[in-house]
Curated annotation (Swiss-Prot):
Source organism superkingdom: Eukaryota
Family: Belongs to the universal ribosomal protein uS19 family.
Pfam families, per the entry: Ribosomal_S19
Name the record gives this protein: Small ribosomal subunit protein uS19c
Keyword Plastid: yes
Keyword Cell division found: no
Primary location group: plastid
Matches recorded under InterPro entries: Ribosomal_uS19, Ribosomal_uS19_bac-type, Ribosomal_uS19_CS, Ribosomal_uS19_SF
Gene: rps19
Subcellular localization(s) per the UniProt record: Plastid, Chloroplast
Any Gene Ontology CC annotation: chloroplast
Amino acid sequence: MARSLKKNPFVANHLLGKIEKLNMREEKEIIVTWSRASTIIPTMIGHTIAIHNGKEHLPIYITDRMVGHKLGEFAPTLTFRGHARNDNRSRR
């Protein structure tokens, strides 16, 4: 179910503060976060945010097409290694 339009999009306070500080100083540096539930807002465009995937932080460059999506959508947590092989030779 989509979030109500009466509410603002969720962005973690610590993440929003870091982005605002970097925008005021006009600096670009990698921002490390565990907040996968935060929504990407227009002030984040042009920054690189390292999003935690459960094991490591994946650096993601934020573009204008990502606005409105969640950070977690761009850092996959599962790696598919293929289905189990049906190896008939090893059964004999």
